[in-house]
Amino acid sequence: MMYREPSDSPWGVVVRCDTLCTGVYSVSTAGHGGIMVQTDAARRLLSPEAQAVGFQAGRYLNFEEDCDAPVVLRELVDSGIIAPRTDNYFRPGEYEACIDRSLQRWNPAYWRARQKRLSVQAAKATKELVERSILRGR
């Protein structure tokens, strides 16, 4: 699949485009913006719950900047694809806390699904650790 920064968006002509990772773009227009994820990249990088938040327009799954873009950011940070931002504005941990507050307010169903997924992953990891410890003890 060929990846190319978008020049047009559901919010208008793109005046700035930052590539977050292959197939994922943070775009700004004269008046608005968001995150645009090429459809095949969305299927590969985002959970079904995250995909459900976006809206399809052309070859992109789109996430409006005010409420829905944090869904993509949370997924990319969780998977280690991007690092949490730290700079003069965000000290360590503050960027993720900001994303989480936004998700809890604007996308509570996604937040609950994410928390459930993390709990299941933690339980699975604990079970595997216990099983390995038991096998070593034999």
Task: Report each predicted region and the residues it spans.
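Eukaryotic non-globular interaction segments with acidic/serine-rich, low-complexity composition
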Residues: 1-29
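Alpha-helical interaction segments
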Residues: 1, 61-62, 96
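A short, structured beta-strand/loop element
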Residues: 26-57
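Basic, alpha-helical nucleic-acid-binding regions used in initiation and control of genome expression
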Residues: 50-51, 110-134
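Short, compact, well-ordered microdomains
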Residues: 66-122
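A short, exposed loop/beta-hairpin motif centered on an aromatic-Gly-Thr core
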Residues: 55-65
